[in-house]
């Protein structure tokens, strides 16, 4: 029987030919698809939100201010125009984001935001699951109160 390590070959430092200003965020959202189960158009909108957030974070250090600017009507309009969707369709997508926990308290759910060094040179991904119960998909938030 062949050793399993011979079957799986992973480069220790894979080089991705993309930048945070390019398609990186679209690939990131696609990578996280099992967690959010968004449609292609919804993933495009989320990727654009993440890209704009990253670019804003280069100049705005305060995260509360960053989130306020990101969720401002002007920024949303720019994202909608970049994605080429109508205002009505954009509102439907935003409602779904809120319902499914992608946006919580007018902020993008922190676990969906990639942790990128300020110079954009390094992205760290760390998965740690002790049991199956810790692997929670995004979805409607359930209240902890009993009726």
Language model: regions and residue ranges:
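A short, conserved structural fragment
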Residues: 85, 90-112
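Alpha-helical hairpin
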Residues: 37-38, 85
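Short, amphipathic alpha-helical interaction segments positioned at domain boundaries
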Residues: 117-147
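Positively charged, structured surface patches that bind polyanionic biopolymers
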Residues: 1-37
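Short helix->loop/beta-hairpin flanking segments within DNA-binding domains
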Residues: 38-74
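Short helix-coil junctions and helix-kink-helix linkers
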Residues: 69-87
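Eukaryotic partner-binding/assembly regions in large regulatory complexes
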Residues: 1-12, 113, 117-126
